[in-house]
């Protein structure tokens, strides 16, 4: 079967399941913001009540929270909800309605520039500046968010303010086509078809990039199957430069930002690195941004009309043929090339045989479609193939080939002329009016009360939409949804034109202008309560006086029920949310029920929490309201207050005794919600009132896990500071993941630092797959996490369930395509950048080298009997790894031999030079290297220690020391800072403004041949370049990155001397010679280890030459017997750099196996945590009165004691409530 036949068969099944309608569902979620993003499923209920005599009445309940995050096992969770206050939009629908929604979104997300009828000055930023289509207000009006952050509405019918630059983000694709230049298949966005060549197509990028012959004319095809538009040849057409969010642009968060503080906070900037696809179905709809804080991620720029970013300094895009771009709205949304649009009345006038033939491939034909041959239907949808979905009075919806349909010529196909003051009747068919309202004010559930009622036209808009007053409310209607009162009601609820008598018209007008048209006293009562009219509520309840706005007396009918419900809510709920205390007091005097639930299970206390009404909550609590009541989503008022960020309400609820740790339907406690919403003050408050940190939600996350997953450092710090259960740090989820695993998985460096340093987390804990946090960090190539764990002593050689160590994982990620790019291992600059940048293709190789240089065993085999080297097909990388391993072994043999059993500080001193007994041990490493205590130390040793100091500084996020003010200011103007280096002397004496006027260097008086502005470091891009290389004369690297360089990263010239920035500014000092040892290290491309690694090296030196077992990194490593030449050393590569060749070896430690002191520390920490955990369990289970017996009796308040004490007390010892009933536990 051919591809076309397959598609046709699939399409023919459409009508087989189309009849009968059905419930509609939600749309598919957008992809999570990058694979390592850290949002987790959190939901909340937000209750909204808006009651106004001018704007109508409605109550809405919605959800809030959410996002998606990377979860263990490669799964991704996502949710989205919106807090709804006021009138909630109506839902419902079916498959056809889904098609309507999808088509109505056509064009949303398109990237646009100004069009031929533009008259809005520089709202867009200027000619060629780009924006994103956010949504269509109507068929004539579209909302655009420009890259500069401006959002406004523009014309897209009659006058065209916009041109479509790129429609690929909308998902428009031309199936079966291929760009004949770049081979993109299928073509997304606009298709450009050569009119002079046979079957030659281009995508937009290639068309505007001048591919193919410029003299050839092209057809522009905007939509699949759409009309072709012939264009003039490109050779003489005008081009404009697109500007906006393109690579190189500087950006901040935009209007749709929902990624918390990934950017570092409001106002923090980042740089666009690349334009990418948010999803495979939406190309060029996202931007990859590197923020100034080092964070990197993907953000929406066009996907579903979203704008996560706003440009601060725009960048240049490509040049485009402006006049060849289509106008936005030429084929307006909701209208196809066949001429049909949503709302049209259509019928089938052809013979049955012809219809059946034409339906092949367009939905097919079934026996139930015979009703279509005699009845008219309404167009309710247009699918992606431009087939028409038609609804009939029976409720069935059928898909048709446009060729079988004919428009019905009737008064309803064109809206009648209306004038202000006309009396109209609203259509009574709910489904029809929902469809008609799309693009005409939309539909709201509260409008259902107006169906079939009489109203008066208050305003006629420019697009013929009507503002109609019905009773005390006003709504915007499609003119097709109403008919003039000069009619009577047909049996089916539609309007049939009949002229009424003058008497009937008079009666209608009288009924229309009665203030209480519906005669529903409960409705008026709830409205009065919502608006705070306490006196009027009193009158309604007393039934004695007449409200001033009603001609009908409350006493003339039945008395108003104080618990009466209107629009799903009671008067107490409406007054509670709006904070009308006087109304609430009136209602309480009339014995209102404070525990009545609305349709979502929310009580008055929930509404008060949503409205931030702490005083109302106090009144309700005194009236006996249950503060722990839960709605249908199992949320308490505390959940709602935390989600809405109402601190005063949270304080009031906790003070009044609200339970701080009840779980909702998702298992989330208020602690989880406070962490998700980053409400740190609320988090502290909850913990102060005893919130339980150990409770897990439905995903298995306790509060600590949740903070680690979300990447919330401030929340993690609060949790670790305030918890009295330190053992919770080691608590595992069902899959064995601890909080440290989650931090490593999601690249949350600050979280990992807090857990390791503040929480004393065990870095070697394993999950169900026996993976440690280091395994996960290596697997995801999170370089900073790897460095943190290695530097803090994580075991590098723990195998997972497959026997793989972290080194196995690193090399497994190193694919053959990546290996080909690493043939030149001498290219230190490139390899170093690979270690700095986790997204670089060489990151896995850099991590492997780093692990090998810090103790990873090259000889360990996994379950498949493979060593790490067996997984590395690149011989050059293998040689590098072996070289690291062998040099480490060689350096270990030069260390003193009796320091393994000493303390960590003693071993560090031994590694730094055990012969020096003075206080210089506590000096910085760079000073220590230069001191006179190393008379035989070579320049390579000094350089190596300087590198160690630099690496330590970087790992602690410290910037290099800055020059003094006198060395920093410009010698000419004294206002700006020095930022220009003179060639060839290499001095820095002036700012960029003054430098052109200087002919001779102000420091050495040498003639200036050239000047060069000092830019950011080419390696890390985090700091300014601050080191001058000789002989090439380049200043392109910072002090941190230059420490290990052998060749200039810009010109690849061998470096002989390095001049520091202070020396270039005229400070004291001498140029630093590049040593042989540093050059050798540069070829490996690794950061030098710090003194933590030197401790491990000193510990390993206790083994004698026969190869006895050595304890290091919390693991005992035994060399392979009889293989003296094998790679059995696992110590630091340059641990012995500070020790001279003349240092005498100390006595060996013999054959005793010595464990490092940090192992004992871990054991002591574990014992302490277990003691605290046991004590916590005792406090939870022991009687709070005698502290001798187990609790086995509980009271109705929820607290308990032992039976002996419970029988003797009358009041609860915890809450002091009277004991009404005692329940024994068995």
UniProtKB/Swiss-Prot annotation:
Ubiquitous in the wing imaginal disk (at protein level). GO terms for biological process: endocytosis; lateral inhibition; Notch signaling pathway; positive regulation of endocytosis; positive regulation of Notch signaling pathway; protein localization; protein polyubiquitination; protein ubiquitination. It catalyses: S-ubiquitinyl-[E2 ubiquitin-conjugating enzyme]-L-cysteine + [acceptor protein]-L-lysine = [E2 ubiquitin-conjugating enzyme]-L-cysteine + N(6)-ubiquitinyl-[acceptor protein]-L-lysine. Residues 100-168, 237-315 form the MIB/HERC2 domain. Zn(2+) 1 binds at residues 179, 182, 203, 206. GO terms for molecular function: ubiquitin protein ligase activity; ubiquitin-protein transferase activity; zinc ion binding. E3 ubiquitin-protein ligase that mediates ubiquitination of Delta (Dl) and Serrate (Ser) receptors, which act as ligands of Notch proteins. Positively regulates the Notch signaling by ubiquitinating the intracellular domain of Dl and Ser, leading to endocytosis of Dl and Ser receptors. Regulates a subset of Notch signaling events, including wing margin specification, leg segmentation and vein determination, that are distinct from those events requiring neuralize (neur) activity. Its EC number is 2.3.2.27. Residues 1-12 have a biased composition (Polar residues). It is found in: Cytoplasm, Cell cortex. It is an enzyme of class 2 (transferase). Zn(2+) 2 binds at residues 194, 197, 212, 216. Residues 1-42, 66-87, 890-919 are annotated as: Disordered. Residues 1159-1181 form a coiled coil. The gene is mib1. Keywords: ANK repeat, Coiled coil, Cytoplasm, Metal-binding, Notch signaling pathway, Repeat, Transferase, Ubl conjugation pathway, Zinc, Zinc-finger. Residues 19-30 have a biased composition (Gly residues). InterPro entries: Ankyrin_rpt, Ankyrin_rpt-contain_sf, MIB1/2_ZZ, Mib_Herc2, Mib_Herc2_sf, SH3_15, Znf_RING, Znf_RING/FYVE/PHD. ANK repeats lie at residues 567-596, 600-629, 633-662, 666-695, 699-731, 735-765, 769-798, 802-833. A zinc finger (ZZ-type) spans 174-226. This is E3 ubiquitin-protein ligase mind-bomb. Residues 31-42, 73-86, 900-914 have a biased composition (Low complexity).
């Amino acid at each position: 079967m051919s591809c076309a036949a397959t598609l046709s068969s699939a399409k023919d099944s459409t009508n087989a399941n189309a009849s009968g309608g059905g419930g509609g569902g939600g749309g598919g979620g957008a992809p999570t913001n990058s694979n390592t993003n850290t949002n987790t499923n959190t939901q909340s209920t937000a209750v909204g009540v808006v009651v106004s005599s001018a704007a109508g009445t409605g109550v809405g309940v919605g959800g809030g929270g959410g996002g998606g995050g990377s979860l263990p096992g490669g799964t991704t969770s996502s949710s989205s909800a919106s807090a709804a206050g006021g009138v909630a939009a109506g839902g419902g629908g079916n498959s056809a309605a889904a098609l309507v929604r999808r088509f109505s979104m056509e064009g949303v997300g398109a990237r646009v520039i100004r069009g031929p009828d533009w008259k809005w000055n520089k709202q867009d930023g200027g000619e060629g500046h780009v924006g994103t289509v956010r949504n269509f207000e109507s068929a004539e009006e579209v909302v655009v968010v420009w890259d500069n952050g401006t959002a406004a509405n523009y014309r897209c019918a009659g006058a065209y303010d916009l041109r479509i630059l790129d429609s690929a983000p909308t998902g428009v694709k031309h199936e079966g086509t291929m760009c004949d230049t770049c081979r993109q298949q299928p073509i997304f966005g606009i298709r450009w078809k050569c009119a002079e060549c046979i079957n030659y197509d281009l995508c937009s990028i290639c068309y505007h990039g001048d591919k193919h012959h410029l003299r050839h004319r092209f057809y522009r095809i905007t939509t699949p199957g759409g009309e072709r538009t012939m264009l003039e040849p490109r050779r003489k057409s005008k081009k404009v430069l697109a500007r906006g969010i393109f690579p190189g642009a500087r950006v901040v968060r935009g209007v749709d930002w929902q990624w918390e503080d990934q950017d570092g906070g409001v106002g923090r900037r980042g740089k666009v690195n690349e334009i990418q696809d948010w999803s495979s179905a939406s190309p060029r709809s996202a931007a990859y941004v590197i923020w100034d804080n080092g964070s990197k991620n993907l953000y929406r720029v066009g996907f579903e009309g979203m704008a996560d970013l706003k440009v601060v300094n725009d960048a240049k895009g490509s040049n485009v043929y402006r006049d060849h771009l289509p106008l936005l709205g030429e084929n307006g949304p909701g209208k196809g090339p066949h001429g049909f649009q949503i709302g049209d009345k259509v019928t089938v006038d052809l013979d049955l045989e012809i219809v059946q033939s034409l339906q092949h491939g367009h939905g097919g034909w079934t026996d139930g479609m015979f009703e279509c041959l005699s009845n008219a239907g309404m167009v309710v949808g247009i699918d992606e193939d431009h087939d028409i979905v038609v609804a009939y009075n029976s409720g069935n919806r059928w898909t048709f080939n446009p060729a079988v349909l004919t428009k019905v010529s009737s008064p309803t196909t064109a809206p009648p002329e209306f004038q202000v003051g006309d009396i109209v009747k609203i259509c009574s068919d709910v489904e029809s009016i929902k469809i008609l309202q799309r693009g005409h004010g939309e539909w709201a559930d509260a409008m259902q009360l107006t169906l079939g009622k009489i109203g008066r036209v208050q305003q006629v808009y420019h697009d013929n939409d009507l503002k109609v007053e019905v009773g005390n409310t006003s709504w915007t209607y499609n003119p097709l949804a109403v008919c003039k009162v000069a009619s009577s009601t047909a049996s089916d609820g539609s309007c049939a034109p009949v002229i009424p008598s003058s008497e009937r018209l008079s009666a209608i007008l009288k009924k229309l202008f009665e203030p209480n048209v519906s005669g529903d006293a409960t409705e008026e009562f709830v409205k009065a309560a919502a608006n705070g009219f306490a006196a009027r509520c009193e009158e309604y309840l007393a039934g004695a006086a007449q409200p001033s706005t009603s001609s009908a007396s409350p006493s003339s009918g039945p008395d108003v029920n104080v618990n009466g419900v209107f629009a799903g809510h009671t008067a107490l709920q409406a007054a509670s949310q709006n904070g009308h205390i006087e109304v609430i007091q009136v209602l309480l005097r009339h014995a209102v029920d404070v525990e009545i639930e609305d349709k979502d299970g929310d009580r008055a206390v929930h509404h008060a929490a949503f409205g931030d009404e702490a005083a109302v909550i106090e009144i309700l609590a005194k009236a006996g309201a249950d503060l722990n009541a839960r709605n249908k989503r199992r949320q308490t008022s505390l959940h709602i207050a935390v989600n809405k960020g109402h601190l005063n309400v949270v304080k009031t609820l906790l003070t009044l005794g609200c339970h701080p740790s009840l779980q909702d339907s998702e298992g989330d406690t208020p602690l989880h919600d406070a962490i998700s919403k980053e409400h740190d003050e609320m988090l502290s408050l909850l913990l102060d009132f005893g919130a339980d940190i150990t409770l897990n939600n439905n995903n298995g996350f306790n509060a600590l896990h949740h903070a680690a997953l979300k990447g919330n450092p401030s929340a993690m710090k609060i949790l670790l500071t305030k918890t009295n259960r330190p053992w919770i740090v080691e608590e595992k989820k069902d899959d064995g993941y601890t909080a440290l695993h989650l931090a490593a998985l999601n690249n949350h460096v600050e979280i990992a630092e807090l857990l390791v340093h503040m929480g004393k987390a065990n870095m070697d804990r394993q999950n169900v797959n026996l993976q440690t946090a280091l395994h996960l960090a290596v697997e995801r190539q999170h370089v900073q996490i790897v460095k943190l764990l290695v530097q803090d002593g994580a075991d590098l050689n723990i195998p997972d369930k497959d026997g793989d160590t972290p080194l196995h994982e690193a090399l497994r990620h190193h694919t053959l395509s990546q290996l080909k790019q690493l043939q030149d291992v001498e290219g230190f600059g490139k390899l170093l950048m690979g270690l700095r940048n986790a997204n670089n293709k060489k990151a896995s190789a850099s991590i492997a080298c780093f692990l090998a240089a810090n103790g990873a065993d090259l000889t360990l085999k996994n379950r498949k009997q493979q060593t790490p080297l067996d997984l590395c097909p690149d011989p050059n990388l293998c040689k590098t790894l072996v070289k690291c391993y062998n040099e480490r072994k060689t350096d270990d043999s030069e260390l003193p031999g009796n320091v393994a059993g000493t303390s960590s500080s003693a071993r560090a001193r031994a590694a730094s030079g055990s012969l020096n007994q003075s206080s210089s041990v506590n000096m910085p490493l760079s000073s220590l290297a230069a001191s006179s205590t190393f008379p035989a130390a070579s320049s390579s040793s000094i350089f190596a220690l300087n590198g160690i100091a630099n690496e330590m500084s970087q790992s602690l996020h410290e910037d290099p020391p800055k020059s003094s003010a006198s060395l920093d200011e410009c010698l000419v103007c004294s206002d700006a800072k020095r930022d220009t280096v003179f060639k060839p002397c290499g001095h820095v004496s002036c700012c960029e403004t003054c430098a052109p006027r200087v002919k001779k260097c102000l420091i050495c008086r040498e003639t200036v041949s050239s000047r060069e502005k000092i830019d950011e470091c080419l390696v890390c891009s985090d700091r300014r370049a601050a080191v001058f290389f000789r002989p090439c004369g380049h200043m392109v690297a910072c002090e941190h990155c230059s420490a290990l360089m052998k060749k200039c990263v810009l010109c690849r010239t061998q470096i002989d001397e390095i001049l520091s920035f202070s020396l270039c500014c005229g400070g004291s000092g001498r140029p630093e010679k590049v040593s042989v040892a540093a050059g050798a290290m540069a070829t490996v491309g690794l950061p030098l280890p710090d003194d933590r690694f030197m401790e491990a090296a000193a510990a390993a030196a206790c083994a004698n030459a026969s190869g006895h077992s050595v304890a290091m990194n919390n693991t005992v490593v035994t060399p392979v017997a009889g293989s003296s030449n094998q790679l059995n050393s696992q110590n630091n590569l340059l641990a012995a750099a500070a020790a001279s060749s003349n240092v005498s070896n100390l006595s060996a430690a013999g054959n005793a196996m010595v464990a490092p002191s940090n192992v004992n520390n871990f054991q002591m920490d574990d014992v302490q945590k277990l003691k605290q955990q046991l004590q916590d369990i005792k406090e939870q289970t022991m009687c709070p009165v005698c502290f001798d017996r187990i609790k086995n009796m509980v009271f109705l308040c929820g607290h308990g004691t032992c039976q002996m004490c419970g029988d003797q007390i009358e009041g609860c010892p915890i809450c002091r409530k009277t004991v009404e009933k005692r329940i024994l536990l068995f």
